[in-house]
């Protein structure tokens, strides 16, 4: 595919350019050869880690792009070494076959190539996200993605991840704002006054919302540092367990309102129809009481998830700011968005004697359904959910999302789709 060839060529050119500069320094500026050689030792391992041929698995492509970006940064830093026009001309002459434009400096070369890279990385990000979705995988490195877009979303791939994340909760106005913000940072464009107003509104809306609140959840978890005496009056709590159908419903309802979703995401008609069926037949929530084992510190919410209690049961803590909340929710819905979660959910439903607790401390790093203790210490939850009813719908859902025909991932790299995603 063209975008793979472009990225491979870009990496080759970076390698050749580094070697050409090194050769030029040896000839013209021996005193600075040592300095540049140290720089090259940093670049070489990154080039070696990059596969000669990009594999089919798209998560490797993100590692590939990460190497590209690191190399670009190192080359930009090294551009200060190239002082004299004589050195620039020598390097340009050595690379004239590959670079036909009139290039003044290393920075100019990188700027021209990075625009191409940004365009390609957006397509790769979209394909990566939707490959995970369609194949029932959740391999997004959310911690890295969080740093990517929260610090300075400079590239189209980070903007695309940012937009995908915002689909999970935001209004169209907020989605457009954050997408434009990422793009403006990428292109170093000043924001208008109207954008600032939208930002204030979006931040206010975010500050009122907790990731779990959108799920209708209150949760319980444990901590072994607590004194059993502190728990005398807190041994019984109410739990609202997540419903797989409602979890999927919340995330995909906003996506389905977008007319372009089937094209932009690669979801076929059967999958969209299955989601629509789940939306129209939600499972009724059930609250249940649980008696905790001694020696455990209860972590719970008292106001629909906006605040929570930690080790000191009398200490009430506000949750993190908007970015952290969005990141937590993004991770949460990613876990709910794959068949691994649904299968785990079915496995738990089949357990007749007990239910696992859910880890509220680390729900951003684990599957929501992962138990944090087992065996005799795992409490028995009374009044279990209507397991047969839930399992029937989930089984039908899994059967219905089998693709009618293999999806061609190359469609996500098309120029028309590129414009579709960003516009």
From Swiss-Prot:
Keywords: Virion
Induction: Expressed in the late phase of the viral replicative cycle.
Localization (cell): Virion
Cellular component terms per the entry's GO annotation: virion component
Family, per entry: Belongs to the asfivirus E423R family.
Name of this protein: Uncharacterized protein E423R
Lineage: Viruses, Varidnaviria, Bamfordvirae, Nucleocytoviricota, Pokkesviricetes
């Amino acid at each position: 595919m063209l975008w793979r060839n472009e990225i491979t060529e870009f990496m080759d050119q970076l390698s050749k350019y580094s070697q050409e500069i090194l050769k030029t320094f040896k000839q013209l500026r021996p005193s600075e050869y040592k300095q540049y050689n140290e720089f090259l030792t940093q670049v070489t391992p990154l080039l070696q880690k990059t596969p000669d041929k990009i594999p089919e698995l798209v998560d490797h492509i993100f590692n590939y792009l990460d190497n590209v970006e690191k190399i670009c940064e190192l080359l930009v830093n090294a551009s200060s070494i190239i002082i004299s026009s004589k050195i620039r001309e020598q390097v340009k002459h050595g690379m004239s076959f590959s670079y036909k434009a009139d290039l003044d400096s290393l920075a100019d070369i990188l700027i021209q190539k990075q625009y191409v890279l940004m365009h390609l990385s957006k397509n790769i990000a979209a394909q990566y996200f939707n490959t995970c979705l369609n194949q029932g995988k959740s391999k997004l490195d959310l911690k890295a993605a969080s740093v990517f877009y929260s610090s300075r979303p400079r590239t189209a791939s980070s903007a695309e991840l940012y937009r995908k994340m915002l689909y999970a909760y935001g209004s169209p106005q907020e989605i457009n704002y954050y997408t434009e913000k990422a793009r403006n940072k990428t292109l170093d464009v000043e924001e208008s006054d109207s954008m600032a107003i939208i930002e204030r509104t979006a931040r206010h809306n975010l500050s009122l919302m907790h990731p779990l609140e959108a799920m209708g959840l209150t949760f319980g978890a444990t901590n072994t540092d607590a004194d059993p005496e502190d728990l005398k009056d807190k041994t019984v709590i109410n739990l609202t367990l997540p419903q797989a159908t409602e979890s999927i419903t919340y995330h995909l309802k906003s996506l389905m309102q977008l007319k372009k979703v089937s094209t932009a995401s690669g979801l076929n008609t059967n999958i969209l129809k299955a989601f629509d069926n789940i939306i129209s037949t939600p499972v009724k929530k059930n609250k249940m009481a649980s008696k905790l084992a001694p020696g455990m510190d209860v972590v719970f919410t008292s106001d629909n998830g906006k605040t929570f209690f930690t080790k000191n049961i009398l200490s009430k803590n506000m949750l993190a700011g908007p970015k952290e909340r969005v990141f937590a929710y993004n991770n949460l819905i990613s876990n709910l968005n794959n068949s691994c979660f649904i299968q785990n959910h079915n496995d738990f439903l089949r357990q007749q004697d007990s239910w696992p607790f859910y880890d509220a401390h680390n729900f951003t790093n684990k599957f929501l359904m992962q138990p944090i203790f087992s065996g005799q210490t795992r409490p028995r939850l009374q009044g279990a959910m209507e397991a047969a009813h839930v399992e029937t719908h989930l089984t039908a859902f899994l059967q219905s999302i089998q693709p009618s025909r293999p999806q061609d991932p190359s469609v996500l790299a098309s120029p028309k789709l590129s414009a579709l995603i960003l516009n």
